[in-house]
A protein has these predicted regions:
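Extracytoplasmic/periplasmic domains immediately adjacent to an N-terminal transmembrane anchor
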Residues: 1-99, 300-501, 673, 698, ...
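Juxtamembrane loop-helix boundary motifs flanking transmembrane segments in multi-pass membrane proteins
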Residues: 77, 90-94, 134-147, 172, ...
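Hydrophobic alpha-helical transmembrane segments of multi-pass membrane transport proteins
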Residues: 88-168, 350, 490-574
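Membrane-spanning helices that line or support transport/gating and their immediate boundary helices
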Residues: 117, 121, 125, 200, ...
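Hydrophobic core positions of alpha-helical segments in small-molecule transporters
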Residues: 147-148, 211-214, 340-341, 505, ...
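Membrane-spanning alpha-helical segments of multipass transporters and channels
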Residues: 155, 166-167, 175-312, 351-352, ...
Length: 705
């Protein structure tokens, strides 16, 4: 089988020649299947579908032979599968991906927005030297000043959060088992805690250009450490401990308690109490914020007694070399930009790889309700505990006690073995066990599904012979003259079936895209700040088309050369340290990176028309960082998205670049395999180049008299 994107192509040799003859004559027949695991959502669904569909196929030669000899279908089925499983996904029985992601990821994006806006509105007071007036209005009380500043935004954010809850659970009909009133109250508490975290971070070092970069990183890390995609309990212990420094982590635990189990306040009061700690900690650091405000007043007083030097744009646009030199100097002498480059590229890259380094979710805790207390039930429990996917948390004869453990998040599933579990097998009847699994984390659900089904197959193989006494003679003849089909499954492109192996290649491309846009936004925004109309000694004029071309070409040259070096670190070096898939041809990857970096540079320069300062662009770029992964089509098949998201895929260079890089790097594809993505990227290069040329032609630049 060969898989391209989310489509499956089955070659004519997927089922080997002579398979039917070998299977029906009792010879050794093997059926192999392959599933696409470079794209996790596609791969996991295909694997489950293959296992479900091929399980009866494996035993069909025996069943067909037995039925042809007069054995009833029920008799032979009971003999072949004496033990069967019944899987019950809790809360999301259809395993709907949109239900799983919609609620948590709205709040993941929401917390990024709250962090950025809170830092920006407080930082603007210091940046524009109005902080002293702000403090004076509050009569010197820093607590009054901060609360008065943030309260209107708290109200606005609360309205947004409550409206979102109504849309999610009312309009979109996402299943909700808790109290909507309590959910709204916890949403408001989450908003206050997130604002408090932003105040705390800003008070440590209140330089808006630096802090916005740091806060955007904090928000993105919070998205990962919320535990929505990869359970934090499966991360390294220091990373797991660090997750509790993020309000979104505690709110996620609260929301899941109400969403999945209709849990009362007693089940999540600890998470709510921790959210209250964030405002209290912010209170302790407010004196430091006041210190910075008073210090800003002193610095402003000194500046007022100095003779300001006229600021001019001492730049010629008649030489590409001059533009290159100026752009390089602007980047290398700006500490905030260097922080984005060093922090965004190196810290971001290392942290993401470190967080997902465990790669696989192991030992998902499960509670056992054993009402059988038989040798067969003990054998099943022992085999289940021996699997790498599951771990027996505790045994209890009381289902309600196991359900309490599930509500308390001590376990992620319940295995129920009925009282007649062993007796039915002994009577020649089919015995059914039940697995109740939470769907708050799909990886945990997948673990329990795989572990229970594979142990079931092992138990069936071990005890099938005992059921031979219940078969008529012709049934025994069918068993003796036939053989089951050997079924073998192989994960393509991601042999470990790990989450990090799937996600990290896509994240590395997003980091390049996001930080490059940030750099362009900060450089062009700073130019707009430093040379406002009518506030500069000099004259201004618009560029000619040739000068605009020089300007665009020079800037783009700097960005592309700089990010080629960073790409070597992110895409070439890090995969070797963290065992990330890296089977692509280096020349093909470089060929793909050329239109991606060009398109991103032109995209940023075209958008610079709307960059009026060096901080505002960071708000937009950081906010949408999480969404780029979804637009790419690696987390959810692009073909299954609504048309407007499919259209958005072709607008942002990051989306086709992620898909192209995954095909090259993780799947070992060639340039021919990424032809649609390459065409999209080159079209974006042309469109955004022309658009950026027009933008710079219309821009006003200032020159020395």
């Amino acid at each position: 089988a060969c898989l391209v994107g989310s489509e499956m192509c089955i070659r004519d040799r997927s089922i080997p020649t002579g398979f039917t003859q070998r299977a029906t004559t009792g010879m050794d027949a093997t059926l192999s299947y392959y599933y696409h695991y470079a794209l996790l959502s596609v791969g996991s669904e295909l694997m489950a579908a293959f296992e479900t569909a091929l399980a009866p196929v494996a035993l069909s030669p025996i069943a067909m032979e037995a039925v042809s000899l007069g054995v009833s279908q029920e008799q032979i089925t009971t003999f072949l599968l004496p033990v069967q499983s019944s899987m019950h996904p809790l809360y999301n029985p259809d395993l709907d991906y949109s239900i799983y992601l919609s609620q948590p990821f709205f709040y993941v994006l929401f917390q990024i927005l709250i962090l950025l806006i809170t830092v920006y509105i407080i930082g603007s007071e210091l940046k524009f030297h109005t902080a002293q007036e702000w403090l004076t209005t509050a009569r010197g009380n820093i607590l009054t000043a901060v609360v008065g500043k943030l309260l209107p935004y708290t109200f606005i954010f609360s309205v947004i959060g409550i409206l979102a809850n109504y849309i999610l659970y009312g309009v979109l009909h996402i299943p909700f088992h808790g109290s909507l009133l309590m959910m709204n109250l916890m949403t408001i508490l989450f908003i206050i805690a997130t604002q408090a975290l932003a105040v705390f971070i800003f008070s440590i070092f209140p330089r808006i250009a630096y802090i916005i970069s740091i806060v955007s990183m904090v928000g993105s890390l919070g998205a990962t450490l919320s535990g929505v995609t990869f359970p934090v309990t499966s991360m390294y212990p220091p990373v797991h401990a660090a997750s509790y420094l993020f309000p979104v982590r505690h709110f996620t635990e609260i929301a899941q308690s109400m969403l999945y189990f209709d849990s009362g306040f007693g089940y999540y009061w600890q998470s709510a109490a921790i959210l209250w700690l964030f405002p209290l900690v912010a209170l302790l650091i407010l004196p430091r914020l006041k210190h910075w405000i008073l210090k800003d007043k002193e610095e402003l007083s000194i500046c007022e007694h100095e003779t300001p030097l006229p600021r001019v744009h001492n730049t010629s646009h008649n030489s590409i070399a001059t533009v290159i030199f100026r752009e390089w100097r602007s980047i290398s002498t700006n500490a905030a930009i260097l922080l984005v480059l060093m922090g965004g590229i190196f810290a971001y890259g290392l942290l993401y790889n470190l967080m997902y380094a465990p790669n696989l979710v192991r030992k998902t805790p499960v509670a056992i309700v054993d009402n059988s207390h038989s040798a067969l039930s003990r054998e099943y429990i022992r085999l289940l505990n021996a699997t790498p996917q599951a771990s027996v948390y505790a045994l209890t004869p009381n289902y309600l006690e196991a359900k309490e453990w599930l509500k308390q998040s001590k376990v992620d599933g319940i295995l129920y073995l009925p009282a007649d579990f062993d007796a039915r097998v002994g009577r020649g009847e089919q015995s059914v066990f039940t697995v109740y699994a939470s769907t708050d984390a799909f990886l945990n659900f997948k673990n329990l599904q795989e572990a229970s089904s594979r142990v079931m197959l092992a138990v069936n193989d071990a005890h099938r012979a005992e059921g031979a006494v219940f078969l008529p003679p012709q049934g025994l003849l069918a068993v003796a003259s036939s053989a089951p089909v050997n079924v073998s499954g192989t994960a393509l492109y991601n042999y470990t079936e790990g989450y990090g192996s799937y996600l990290i290649p896509a994240v590395m491309i997003i980091i390049i895209f996001q930080t490059l846009l940030m750099v362009i936004g900060m450089v062009t925004g700073e130019e707009a700040e430093e040379f406002p109309k009518g506030k500069v000694v000099g004259k201004h004029k618009k560029l000619t088309w040739l000068q605009a071309l020089y300007n665009i070409s020079g800037r783009t040259f700097v960005y592309v050369m700089l990010y080629f070096v960073f790409a070597l670190f992110l895409l070439g070096l890090l995969p070797h340290f963290f065992s990330i898939p890296n089977i692509g041809n280096g020349r093909d990857i470089i060929t793909m990176m050329i239109p991606f970096l060009l398109g991103t540079s032109f995209f940023g320069l075209a958008a610079s028309r709307y960059f009026t300062d060096s901080e505002a662009p960071l708000l937009m770029i950081a906010f949408f960082s999480v969404g780029y992964i979804f637009l790419s089509g690696v987390s959810y098949p692009l073909e299954l998205m609504p048309w407007y998201w499919q259209a958005a895929h072709y607008v942002v260079p990051a989306a086709p670049a992620v898909l192209a890089f995954v095909k090259l790097n993780s799947m070992g594809g060639t340039l021919a395999d990424i032809r649609p993505e390459m065409i999209t990227l080159w079209i974006q290069v042309i469109v955004y180049f022309l658009l950026s040329l027009w933008v710079f032609k219309k821009k006003v630049f200032y020159f020395r008299h």
